């Protein structure tokens, strides 16, 4: 339990003891304490006096006074109590309790903020999963940044997380990729008789793949058409995935599993789920096609599994894939999908219900669109290539840190304008610069302290920390673990980015309000330990969203 929860629990226990001591109730109702909207009204407040009115048969202000008179303020860490309005009790805490967070942060280091106890739940988080047919773009970048941050947050909150990328390597788009490579392969060999397919891929990368294969494997030209296309499918996916993996690694995004759609066919899992759904009575034949009764489970219409020409829809392997996720022992399935996948939510949930799996175990987040902005105007095409701007170009333009930070600043269900000019600014107007500068500034102060012979120590007299800005800063440090818990519970990576901004802001305010290194050696030691706790917290929070914490800027 974190220090904030401990203090709240202690306060509730002491209020209950006070009610008991005052003889106000035999059975004490649920005591709720809240943080007042206005900090002038204390650190916490409760309406318990009004709740007790009918039980105690007394005026609520009178009840409130009885609670105050019988409260052990020392145990409750309370220095002042006010009774307001009809009977609200406002508590002002003795904030020395907050200094306990300093040695805790120093001792835990890079584990500070992490929950000690395992949730005992396995989470499979699938994100990015872009088709291996071209470069990653801004939508994929947002998916990668949010997905990786969410995986870090859930891990810190005590979940067992598996990060997975689903490789769509079995559909028509891969056939088109193979045909496109075939055209470029023969062109490189001087044979222009192979035309590009109607839905082919015309990127420079396909030309390069064709040239490379013509140089390294010219013997492919002698294969039968079937064998040649099979080889181009395999090699095309390998080339594209190698490129995607490289870009994602550079974007500080990593996966535990790369799950191939083709493996579902090879292992017979497609036929397995088809037979199972048929056996359970959820499929039927109509218009020469095979349908799934998803309307039985709140979908707006039934869905086709096998088209009247005998080919599978995309939905069928998706069902097999999600059933495979469940079979692997995952308790929670989280999918991060692009904005064009909104219609998939109900049908995927319905498909799980056909197997008797609670569809609430599947959580789908839709990533809304991102617009790249420069000088107030949307930038749709690369000046260099004339094509859509790639993740690699974004990394080259603004850097990994800025891209990761900006893309996790907003809730994924909201549209976002990515200001590339702001992301490059070395000023405190740039959110990521502002946050990283706070860390670098602390490192600079710690270096000065060390030069003066003052080392960071967890054991110090912290009673000298009385400045209001210092107390507010410590409250923010103490709020790190609850913020991680909240971000994990709501699957909201942007809560961590917002926290980082607040923590950096509180540090800068403290720095501007009070000198860290003073003539008072004890006070200086306490300050040095405190800002080290802030530095650890900042570094851990930045790492959670995949951003570095530089020691100098």
Swiss-Prot record:
What Pfam families does this protein's entry cite? Arg_tRNA_synt_N (PF03485), DALR_1 (PF05746), tRNA-synt_1d (PF00750)
Give the E.C. number(s): 6.1.1.19
Domain of life (superkingdom): Bacteria
Q: Which GO BP terms, alphabetically? A: arginyl-tRNA aminoacylation
Catalysed reaction(s) here are:
tRNA(Arg) + L-arginine + ATP = L-arginyl-tRNA(Arg) + AMP + diphosphate
Q: Name one GO molecular function term.
A: ATP binding
Motif: 'HIGH' region; annotated at 130-140
The subcellular localization recorded is:
Cytoplasm
- Could you name the Gene Ontology cellular component terms for this entry? cytoplasm
Q: Which InterPro entries match?
A: aa-tRNA-synth_I_CS (IPR001412), Arg-tRNA-ligase (IPR001278), Arg-tRNA-synth_N (IPR005148), Arg-tRNA-synth_N_sf (IPR036695), ArgRS_core (IPR035684), DALR_anticod-bd (IPR008909), Rossmann-like_a/b/a_fold (IPR014729), tRNAsynth_Ia_anticodon-bd (IPR009080)
Q: What is its main location?
A: cytoplasm
* TM region positions: none
Keyword line: Aminoacyl-tRNA synthetase, ATP-binding, Cytoplasm, Ligase, Nucleotide-binding, Protein biosynthesis
Assigned protein family: Belongs to the class-I aminoacyl-tRNA synthetase family.
Looking up PANTHER family in the UniProt record yields: ARGININE--TRNA LIGASE, CYTOPLASMIC (PTHR11956:SF5), ARGINYL-TRNA SYNTHETASE (PTHR11956)
Q: What NCBIfam families does this protein's entry cite?
A: argS (TIGR00456)
Q: How does it assemble?
A: Monomer.
Q: What is this protein called?
A: Arginine--tRNA ligase
Q: Which organism is it from?
A: Staphylococcus aureus (strain MRSA252)
Q: Please state the gene responsible for encoding this protein.
A: argS
